[in-house]
Amino acid sequence: MIPLLESVARPDGYLHCGPSGAGHYVKMVHNGIEYAMLQALGEGFEMLRSAPYDLDMTAIARDWNNGCVIRSWMLELLGDALEGDPRLDTLTGDVGGGETGRWMVETAMELGVPTPSIALSLLMRFRSRQDDTFAGRVVAAVRREFGGHAVKEAE
């Protein structure tokens, strides 16, 4: 099976992590990191939207993704989402998801590993079901862009 996976993977895009379960564990941690990174993007762009300036958030996302220390594929995807809907008015801030984040936080607690950023980002996903915030819209929009995750359309 490994030769088949290696033959279809992009260069350096395949990793055998160890015995049964190790790959799922690594993916769980990956998703936890993703939760925190998305939450940080959402909070930062909500700050930009709340500023007393008329800021072009699409241009900011594009600029930050061009050599800035926080450049990332997620920031590129946010720029794409903002390009078509600069205020993200077509969707709600209900982020959805939460299953792998919960697994990550529960596992961290069992191991005694502090993961406050990831835990708080999980709680903010639950909060997004109650409150429609721009930060939640940012997270939902980027999740739609990279994973085709469903978003709730604004009424």
Model-derived features with residue positions:
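Phosphate/pyrophosphate-binding betaalpha-module
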Residues: 1-6, 14-17
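ATP-dependent carboxylate/acyl-activation modules
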Residues: 6-7, 144, 148-155
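A conserved ligand/cofactor-binding region detector
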Residues: 10
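Helical "substrate-binding/catalytic lid" subdomain
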Residues: 21-149
